[in-house]
Amino acid sequence: MDSKYASIGREKPKITNDLTVKRLKLCVNNANTKKDKEQTNNGAASNNKLENNFSKENTEDLKEARKSLPVYLVRARIIEEIKKHDTMILIGETGSGKTTQIPQLIHEHRLEGKSCVAVTQPRRVAAITLALRVAAEMNTDIGSIVGYSVRFEDVTSPRTKVKYLTDGMLLREAVSDPLLKKYSVIVLDEAHERTVNTDVLFGIVKLAQKERNGQKQNPLKVIVMSATMDVDSFRKYYDNCPVIYLEGRTYPVTIYHSKIKHEDYQYAAICTIFQLHTTTPANEDFLVFLTGQEEIETVMTNIKQIAKETVGPQIRVCPLYAGLPAAKQLLVWKKTPPGMRKIVLATNIAEASVTIPEIRYVIDTGVVKERTWCTRTGAERLSVVPCSQAASWQRAGRAGRTAPGASYRLYTATDFKCRRQHNLPEIVRCPLTSTVLMLIATGLDPATFPLIDTPPKDSIHAALLLLKELGAVDNESNPKLTVLGKKLTAFPIDPKYAKILLCAPEYGCLEEVILMERIKH
């Protein structure tokens, strides 16, 4: 029987013949077991154990691994370019080692001086795991020379010289310190993500660099990094700064496209998982891309049900999504015993930055959740849409980090060619209330703030109008923060919900509001 996949690249034995798997009704496991509660309560302890696992890796092995990375082989040229230019763009293919090695090289050559190197990440799990890895490579305790800062968790000290943090955390620091004086080098990683926070950070850092150089203060160096991004737009934005390209160290990845369109991509993913599971060796792990927690829990429940009736290696299913507690997120990196296969069910959180060892097969559903809103009604919507071509390649690259692999795309080659090349920037499709409030708090004019892509005027006007209605600013034409507005900036949440929290004690419903906020986030 023909494979339901068309391959790109070299031919490979067909491993996707139909299985006698009955089609079952997909179900969601909502049970809160005693075991789940115990794991949640012991989350901090698990987190500490996993941090210890990072640090216990053989130091000599880590040193040898560093030396084999492409970025390490051209380290002299990179350091020379950083010394020569205040701003540079670095395009490094998957596996080049740019995210872990560039900050270390800067520190080893003392280019940060008496200040600190900041490395931004769009997601919290990436900031944490990268910091743990770099601390292990530098043979230091996390929170000492190397640290991280994410929402509600700051693991740094006065000694910290390399700091991994989410872009949102650096934005909050800019409110009290617009010139970002505590940093001498800022690395803006995963620039292709184009979240609202990353786009605003580009402008904040650009203005801080210009102001510091104009005042003859400690100069600020900026390094913009990505594996896939629109280089021309970024280069133009940063005044034609130099661009350096790094080769990757990826292994061959064979791409297979579905020959037909799948209406039910969850079912297609489950079928593909077990077709591969029964025909490939154990300890060759799978990474499956889904759109959110509900889908992940649904697929996880069905995998466990089917595994009971299917021959093959034992299975460990690991979820990975933004709302998962940090301790459970880090379980993804825990090695499985011999003879057991790990299946990681992840959102696009696993597309970039983080490397999950032993992933040999990627199952790409080809979809992602995208946030949009209507300026007329103010209603937000989270829709499942096709991911971009760049995202598809990023996903495929997860299979080739440590060994040759394959990516099974549950969509046709024609469908892939019709997709947009890059992600649509969030700033042109999302509400900007929080962003505008932050810019005003930083002393910047939202109307003239330099952005790579200019948001619709209706978006900025709607944000100013809402802030005025909330009482956060005094007027719309030349907005200044009110006393309430200053209080709202202290909360890392939407200004609407921040005001609800502030007003809740007056109405005696603080606990209920906190519970609602917790559910929402």
State the predicted function of each range:
Residues 510-521:
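C-terminal helical accessory/scaffold domains
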Residues 1-500, 504-507:
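P-loop NTPase motor module signature
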